[in-house]
Amino acid sequence: MKYKRIVFKVGTSSITHSDGSLSRGKIQTITRQLAALHHAGHELVLVSSGAVAAGFGALGFKKRPVKIADKQASAAVGQGLLMEEYTANLSSDGIVSAQILLSRADFADKRRYQNAGGALSVLLQRRAVPIINENDTVSVEELKIGDNDTLSAQVAAMIQADLLVLLTDIDGLYTGNPNSNPDAVRLDKIEHINHEIIEMAGGSGSANGTGGMLTKIKAATIATESGVPVYICSSLKPDALAEAADNQADGSFFVPRAKGLRTQKQWLAFYSESRGGVYVDEGAEHALSEQGKSLLMSGIAGIEGHFSRMDTVTVYSKATKQPLGKGRVLFGSAAAEDLLKLRKAKGVFIHRDDWISITPEIRLLLTEF
């Protein structure tokens, strides 16, 4: 079995009718495939959108609401209805499902991040199928993960999945928008995600969901940097899930980084919030970027912001002002500044185990999305 632990993500358009309402037939198609894979021995996680779509009709809205409060109320009703559909279908095949609602704060806080990963691991060990969505009812708009493509990649990285499959209404990444450009060609295999790939993704999207092709490229970047391969393929094919699990999907395949980031490094790179900045001299820059060493106090050339011990900070080159990476500090900003002034700056400021260098792909995540 090439891919045992698989995360599938289905978007709103993959489980709804053209009017935006929930399609029980489409959900049954997905759960039928999940059940077959589960019984074949795969460990499965489903990240599913559709809570708003499932709930807005029950609240008397004629169409999908636009106002934030209306969407959150619809999600509150719809999440239960959505889970009811998934649970009924999976339980008829003898499969236990579990609901997990996550938010950006669950990833930003290291302890909550570890707890979520632990719960998911137990569910998979006990042969349950976790069904995950963002907690839309209570999430603050400015602090949301924002789309389930990104959420699915974060989950896949967290549990060290063998494969992430992003199911959509477009069968992969094209050189242009296939709906409007007859000359657009699908890319079947993507070795590296760069500016050109991001430009290609800018024109594709769907009317009902919030995650267009650009968010799928962001998700693919997070996953592949974490060592997880990614398929983007159409949910419209009756055996799309099985084909992806068998490495035969009709879509775009993203090749993972040869040595994926460990969980601690993932958290530093993608989720930890930087509380300040540190500028380092040329020697420290070389030690961090080229030799994989810890950052010593003696290499610090400047500090900005206010941060505490074990906070995450961004480290910059004094010469170029470009970010070199992120790390958790062993001294707060006040203590570090005092030591620097007294010329008693000795010891380790950021240990190499709590450091992540910014690769070109991670830089794209920080600057392009």
Curated annotation (Swiss-Prot):
Substrate binds at S49, D136, N148. The keyword Membrane does not apply. GO terms for biological process: L-proline biosynthetic process. Keywords: Amino-acid biosynthesis, ATP-binding, Cytoplasm, Kinase, Nucleotide-binding, Proline biosynthesis, Transferase. Pathway: Amino-acid biosynthesis; L-proline biosynthesis; L-glutamate 5-semialdehyde from L-glutamate: step 1/2. Residues 275-355 form the PUA domain. GO terms for molecular function: ATP binding; glutamate 5-kinase activity; RNA binding. It is found in: Cytoplasm. GO terms for cellular component: cytosol. Its main location: cytoplasm. Pfam families: AA_kinase, PUA. The keyword Kinase applies. InterPro entries: AceGlu_kinase-like_sf, Asp/Glu/Uridylate_kinase, G5K_ProB, Glu/AcGlu_kinase, Glu_5kinase, Glu_5kinase/COase_Synthase, Glutamate_5-kinase_CS, PUA. It catalyses: L-glutamate + ATP = L-glutamyl 5-phosphate + ADP. ATP binds at K9, T168, D169, T210, G211, G212, M213, L214, T215, K216. It comes from the Bacteria. Its EC number is 2.7.2.11. Catalyzes the transfer of a phosphate group to glutamate to form L-glutamate 5-phosphate. Belongs to the glutamate 5-kinase family. This is Glutamate 5-kinase. It comes from Neisseria meningitidis serogroup A / serotype 4A (strain DSM 15465 / Z2491).
